[in-house]
Amino acid sequence: MVSKLLKTITQPVRGLHQAAYLLASLTLASQVLALVRDRLFAHQFGAGEMLDLYYAAFRVPDLVFALVASLVSAYVLIPRIAGADPVESRRLISQTASFLFIAGGIMCGVIALFTPTLLTLVYPNLMQGAYASEFVFLTRLLLLQPIILGLSGVATSVTQVKRKFFIFALSPVLYNLGIIGGTVFLYPVFGLPGVGMGVVIGALAHFIIHVPVLMEAKLTPRFVIPDPKVLWLVMKDSLPRSMALGMGAFVTLALTALAARTGEGGVSVFTLAGNLEAVPLSLIGAAYATAAFPVLAEHHRKKQGVAYRDTIS
């Protein structure tokens, strides 16, 4: 029974529509869990100061993720490893994973050092509250997330190329389960930092589920000193997208800072509305795009123009 389940989970999904339906189904499950998560937050904290602090603590780590991880994201790696030589693919994955670990670690370390000052500048109202120390600790804890999810993003490039879409779609489900577990089990013991621990656990689960795919494909990254020439070949194509994502994250940070100035619950209402808005895009647009992209990348690499057009149509 267990072996049959594992075989189903790890089996490649070849058909485009089959992959899209699978992704949409698991995305729906993930979004339902996200709604359960938000409902738990509203029940546990209410749309007040504690929930404001939780959502506000994500904004700086999200900005780091947008600026660093998007430079070497799966969307840039997939066209380079789809149908490519395994040795070259592993070299590229090792280079990008090492860059993310080093650059993300340095940036997050510097921000962690100056977190109290930064939060006072961005969220002066929240830093004047009774939970300022917990807010600082939670933000520092969440700075682990960009590094972990960045590495997971590199791993998902292999998962998508190998068309293990069940595993790919399961990772955000595990992420939300980690947050829910942190809210239910760790918050009563540790308070608000306990929810942050759940976020980190969820991020680790998001990454770890891809490790067997990396091992099976013999593409497990090794720690190396990044080669600027290799990285530049990747980054030059991702700079426009990275700048757009970075600007989007910065705008969200600015809007969250403004929401924090409107009074208690402002950040919570703004964030919950944004979470609801993302549901239809994730269910429909992202599912087909995720399923089609590795197939299109492989057709392009192999110069299969007819197959490329057929997939799009």
Residue locations for each model-derived region?
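Interhelical loop/hinge segments that connect adjacent transmembrane helices in multipass membrane
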Residues: 2-16, 211-248, 306
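Alpha-helical transmembrane segments of multi-pass membrane transporters/permeases
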Residues: 21-26, 144, 155-184
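Helix-loop junctions and terminal segments of transmembrane helices
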Residues: 70-85, 286-303
